[in-house]
Amino acid sequence: MAVNVNTNVSAMTAQRYLNSASNAQQLSMERLSSGFKINNAKDDAAGLQISNRLNVQSRGLDVAVRNANDGISIAQTAEGAMNETTNILQRMRDLSLQSSNGSNSKADRVAIQEEITALNDELNRIAETTSFGGNKLLNGTFETKSFQIGADNGEAVMLSLNNMRSDNAMMGGKSYQAANGQDKDWTVKAGANDLTITLTDKRTGEQTINLSAKDGDDIEELATYINGQTDMLKASVDDEGKLQIFTDSNRIDGVATFGGSLAGELSFQAAKDVTVDTIDVTSVGGSQESVAIVDAALQFVDSHRAQLGAFQNRFNHAINNLDNINENVNASKSRIKDTDFAKETTALTKSQILSQASSSVLAQAKQAPNAALGLLG
């Protein structure tokens, strides 16, 4: 083996391995202290790009879950208020039935009307004051809003909240009253007992109801017969013996038309819009009609509450799915970017041992040129 003074190859080799061990030790310490095995693009360019995309998706999913929870909160707030609206309407219905009883005097009905007016005011107050985050929910101003429940654009769900004020047309319907009242001796005559009602059902389109009353039926029995033939309208009789028919705006579109011999004899007047806001139970006829109006309003409220319940269930399932996606996305990101501490501590120990060994060898290699002095004597 040649003895050189100017070039110490052994020292250079030891130095190179010492630098390599030091770099490996520094890298392991960086990974262990940060918790990430990818801290710079040079660590893993492709892995960094993929993990960043997954991180963006994960953060988007977190926001989507918060958005969905906000949507559920809005629906719960609105549905809770509508529950009280339902209670008010049920009380109004009870009062309407009570007022329609013949044992009540005019003063009794006026007192009942006062309670109905107070209930109506509270119903409207609930509709006007129910809010979430400054947004009014039930007075008709919320309309339709979108809720972003996905990590990317275009993943939105629409929520509509209806107007729950008592003067909303959907909280009632149309009233048709016969111009000619019938006394207790009036009966349906043979050959003049037909009545046709043409109306447009929102679900099935235009329909014509053909009714043939029995000979000898009085006006009350005629109303009962009409109610027994179809659930698309409600018939009742007022104090003056006038037949009145109510159609629900939630089910019937537009106005109904009447034909047949009975229609000519009774002479129905033009349709009149009626809602919970116009309820008047100071008369028997008004009390009877009020029951039908409240039933229509209850149907409207219950239908919307069912929609909100379905909306909440849908969002709960959406949140479960988002959480599942987020879990898998983060698991994938972790496999790419996170430090494996067991593996990295092993690598650190290895690099520390190699560093110490390289330092020891380098120290010995630096002493090799001293052998030349021995040769010089």
Curated annotation (Swiss-Prot):
A Pfam family of this chain? Flagellin_C
Q: Give start-end ranges for the coiled-coil region(s).
A: 103-129, 301-340
Keywords on record: Bacterial flagellum, Coiled coil, Secreted
**Is rRNA-binding tagged as a keyword?**
no
Q: GO CC terms for this protein?
A: bacterial-type flagellum; extracellular region
Q: Which domain of life is it from?
A: Bacteria
Give the subcellular location: Secreted; Bacterial flagellum
Q: Which InterPro entries does UniProt cross-reference here?
A: Flagellin (IPR001492), Flagellin_C (IPR046358), Flagellin_C_sub2 (IPR042187), Flagellin_hook_IN_motif (IPR010810), Flagellin_N (IPR001029)
**What Gene Ontology terms describe what this protein does at the molecular function level?**
structural molecule activity
> SUPFAM superfamilies under this entry?
Phase 1 flagellin
Main location group: secreted
Report the sequence similarity comment from the record.
Answer: Belongs to the bacterial flagellin family.
Q: What function does the entry list?
A: Flagellin is the subunit protein which polymerizes to form the filaments of bacterial flagella. FlaC is not essential for flagellar synthesis and motility.
Q: How does it assemble?
A: Heteromer of multiple flagellin subunits including FlaA, FlaB, FlaC, FlaD and possibly FlaE.
Q: Which NCBIfam families match?
A: PRK08869.1-1, PRK08869.1-3
**Per its record, how is this protein called by name?**
Flagellin C
Organism equals Vibrio anguillarum (Listonella anguillarum)
